[in-house]
């Protein structure tokens, strides 16, 4: 039973480490969903972001954020020499770094273990480390043992991800999150499988602390994705949405597990979309009979 005088008073705030965010949603850390301009916009307005790791100098980005005193400084890294070098430069220069996301397709890997152990030698408690992607409770437990503060959960469920078709490896989003949450008490970032705002509420109900969305943002008018005109009708506009493991992003034809697709451009902005998500989550909280996101954890939400 709901006791809210109006759904507008329901709180959609969530927190990671010491940082509070207005909604439990983060744009995918892909080039078509996030760039420096959008990252700054999100940081200024108390939304979470994770900067992508492609064609970017992480040291220079973190340095810029420190110089401009961003509210949150959040990067992605891989497991290569260039990533170790960037981290070393950041730590040696005593730059503030709030969030590090180790972003690899198969997070339950010895290379991830090595870089987590490296990070833990130098980081302070102010730096929060996210690692992924994984899809099993055992993998989550190992990542926590290796030093991760949060786990990015999801394999093969993204709209432009072809991992499940090319390799056979995947797991439904809700089941995946629920299995990990039941066995491993760690902050979970759900990644992949969100097609509408209601799926965000379902992911929270399954046990996620934060939900990553790609296509939901890539198609917006102010996304970093290029605008493409319909060749037969120039008034019809599209945005290019492509996965991190796509040939479009990798600039190579090997080990491709993603595709590029044109999606209709939405004439709305990031801030408009995030406000819509906030309102829909407030309604979900009202239906759950609670006052905040925690209420979604105590109910069963079906997929229909």
PLM region descriptions:
Residues 1-187, 215-217:
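Active-site entrance/lid segments in N-terminal catalytic domains of soluble metabolic enzymes
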């Amino acid at each position: 039973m709901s006791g809210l005088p109006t759904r507008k008073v329901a709180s959609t705030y969530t927190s990671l480490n010491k940082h509070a965010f207005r909604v439990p949603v983060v744009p995918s850390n892909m080039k078509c969903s996030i760039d420096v301009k959008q990252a700054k916009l999100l940081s200024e307005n108390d939304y979470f972001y994770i900067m992508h790791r492609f064609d970017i100098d992480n040291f220079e980005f973190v340095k810029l954020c420190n110089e401009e005193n961003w509210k949150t400084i959040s990067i992605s890294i891989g497991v290569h020499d260039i990533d170790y070098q960037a981290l070393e430069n950041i730590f040696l220069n005593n730059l503030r770094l709030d969030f590090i996301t180790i972003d690899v397709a198969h997070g339950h890997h010895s290379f991830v273990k090595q870089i987590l152990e490296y990070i833990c030698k130098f980081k302070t408690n102010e730096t929060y480390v996210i690692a992924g992607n994984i899809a099993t409770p055992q993998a989550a437990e190992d990542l926590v043992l290796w030093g991760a503060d949060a786990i990015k959960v999801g394999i093969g469920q993204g709209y432009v991800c072809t991992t499940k078709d090319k390799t056979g490896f995947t797991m439904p989003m809700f089941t995946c999150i629920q299995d990990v949450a039941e066995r491993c008490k760690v902050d979970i970032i759900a990644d992949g499988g969100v097609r509408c705002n209601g799926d965000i509420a379902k992911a929270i109900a399954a046990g996620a602390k934060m939900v990553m969305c790609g296509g939901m943002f890539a198609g917006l008018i102010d996304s970093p994705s290029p605008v493409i005109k319909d060749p037969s009708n120039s008034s019809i506009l599209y945005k290019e949405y492509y996965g991190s493991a796509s040939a479009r992003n990798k600039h190579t034809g090997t080990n491709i597990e993603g595709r590029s697709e044109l999606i209709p451009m939405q004439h709305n902005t990031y801030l408009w979309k995030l406000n819509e998500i906030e309102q829909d989550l407030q309604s979900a909280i009202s239906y759950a009979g609670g006052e905040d996101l925690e209420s979604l954890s105590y109910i069963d939400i079906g997929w229909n």
